[in-house]
Amino acid sequence: MADVAHQETHGFQTEVKQLLQLMIHSLYSNKEIFLRELVSNAADAADKLRFKALSNDSLYEGDGDLCVKLSIDKDAGSITISDNGIGMDRASVIEHLGTIAKSGTSEFFSNLSGDQAKDSQLIGQFGVGFYSAFIVAEKVVVRSRAAGDDASKGVEWTSEGEGEFTVADIEKADRGTEITLFLREDEKEFADDWRLRSIVSKYSDHISIPVMMYKEEVPESDGPDGEKVPAQPAKWEAVNKATALWTRDKSEVSDEEYKEFYKHISHDFADPLVWSHNKVEGKTEYNSLLYIPAKAPFDMWNRDQKHGLKLYVQRVFIMDDAEQFMPTYLRFVKGLLDSNDLPLNVSREILQDNKITQAIRQGCTKRVLQMLERVAKNDSEKYQGFWAEFGNVLKEGPAEDHANKEKVAGLLRFASTENDSDAQNVSLADYVSRMKDGQDKIYYITADSYKAAKSSPHLEIFRKKGIEVLLMSDRVDEWLMSHLTEFDEKSFQSITHGELDLGDLDDEDSKKAQEEAEKQVEGLTERVKTVLGDKVAEVKFTHRLTDSPACIVADGTGMSTQMIKLMQAAGQPVPEAKYHFELNPEHSLVKMLADEQDEERFGQWTEVLFDQAALSEQGSLKDPAAFVHNLNTLLMNLAK
């Protein structure tokens, strides 16, 4: 045992205590993942050493054969996972093994529901890593020394996972980290050579460095025909394939191997939704292995959270989270790139304005969109699952990626008046295929909620004529539509914003009936404008309504109601919006208003109709007290 000095006891960060408790209770049905997590970390440590040694070869300390070793001590009831990777110094041990240095941590804990299955999935997304050791261990001892440090700079970390840990200085001749798990009494099944070999084969076959286990000496024996079978000396042997999975031919890699590799790079517990493995040759050469997760990570909307792909150059790990190879609207994509063209000393700054980077980014973006198109075409139910998780992120695409705007638009899904449901399952291609003869626009409405969109008076004329309207109620929709102007050469038109042009969908008989109705209430618009004054830009008759007496419409050159709400919610200054007040000349209330000779009552009715229309469109009023007063006055008059 190493000499121990300068020993200190520290308390775990509160979040670590919570995570340890959650893991022990939520992951007990999948205990063996502890080995996957620890072997995965050991492989990452080897990758990091290989990268650092590119600029400082002495870090290898004469030992460049990187590997992970698993050993068992049945008498002590322990397993040890050791690596000769980058290692840690005292400060790193305290930071990495005592805290969770991850943005969005509090958000993660607030999302936990108490439902074991859901929580275990969420914990998997969070990435439990090292702490998974406590699923099976009652005590964990970590000994580590950073590559390049003296043997006297070793550090030992010990904990029973119950609130605190001790850290001490030790002598450690070899660089790297060894983790010893003292197994709980009911977990001793893991202190078995064949059990560990089967777990490594199941979860870690794809790890690109060898995972070694000790094979005992096999004495000389007699063969079936009496010949002597020579003795085999004891030795360390690799129990995994130890080749970089992404360099292998697609036909040689099983679905199970792809799934386990995804879990290795993403630390997700769930299988991916779909993946794409490609070898690109020609002007730019690289391998890519891209995965679309089945579930959105809890921190997808956290601006501080890094997103991106693992980057390798000539099979040497360079960095995690290389965001330059994927547009922001595809930030949920996991995977890796292995380039033959980038320099080994590449940095994030070099990647920023690099032609090779741009070519790879374009290629990877195209691959992901093609993957999604295939899923949407071949398995609509699976695609709806994807849309429920990532639809709002994909809606950022048309604004960010002009080159692929049409492709992204084809992947979008919306609710529609075609279905009596808030399910977003109508594609733009579906809509276009159902367009009426003479229809040249794609009509849509944006609102605070599906219910508000569905019950908007602006839909009335479309229902009457049987014209489909897309119902949009996500916060991102208004912003999306400001960047999405057409699809399949059909332009979009908001039914609440600007003039309503039904083009050839308006028949001559309808137009004549409209003109006749307007004659019956001639002069009304001028009287109403006099009452409302500067509150409105214009008062006019409309035929977009069939059941409602009036509506307000945002000016075609100004902001829509939803955009104003978005900007106000973001604390942005918003110019005063002027609306057009539109009256339905065929409605009995409007006819009654035209016949009203008492100017005071006329004013009150006008204000009430305007406020009703504003309430329907905006969801609130600037002066609700005045609305209530006018309404009460009119009700009292009617009651007399």
Swiss-Prot record:
Task: Report which superkingdom the organism of origin falls in.
Answer: Bacteria
Concerning SUPFAM superfamilies, the annotation shows: ATPase domain of HSP90 chaperone/DNA topoisomerase II/histidine kinase, HSP90 C-terminal domain, Ribosomal protein S5 domain 2-like
Residue span of region A:
1-348
Xref: Gene3D superfamilies: 3.30.230.80, 3.40.50.11260, Heat shock protein 90, C-terminal domain, Histidine kinase-like ATPase, C-terminal domain
Please provide, in alphabetical order, the Gene Ontology terms of the cellular component aspect for this entry.
cytoplasm
* Keyword vocabulary terms for this entry: ATP-binding, Chaperone, Cytoplasm, Nucleotide-binding, Stress response
InterPro entries, per database record = HATPase_C_sf, Heat_shock_protein_90_CS, HSP90_C, Hsp90_fam, Hsp90_N, Ribosomal_Su5_D2-typ_SF
Subcellular localization is given as: Cytoplasm
> Region B: start and end of each range?
349-565
Q: Where is this region: C?
A: 566-640
Q: Any S-S bridges, and between which cysteines?
A: none
Concerning Pfam families, the annotation shows:
HATPase_c_3, HSP90
Asked whether the UniProt record includes Transferase among its keywords, one would answer no
Its assembly, as annotated, is: Homodimer.
Q: According to its UniProt record, which protein family does this protein belong to?
A: Belongs to the heat shock protein 90 family.
What this protein is reported to do is described as: Molecular chaperone. Has ATPase activity.
Protein name (Swiss-Prot/TrEMBL): Chaperone protein HtpG
Organism of provenance: Pseudoalteromonas atlantica (strain T6c / ATCC BAA-1087)
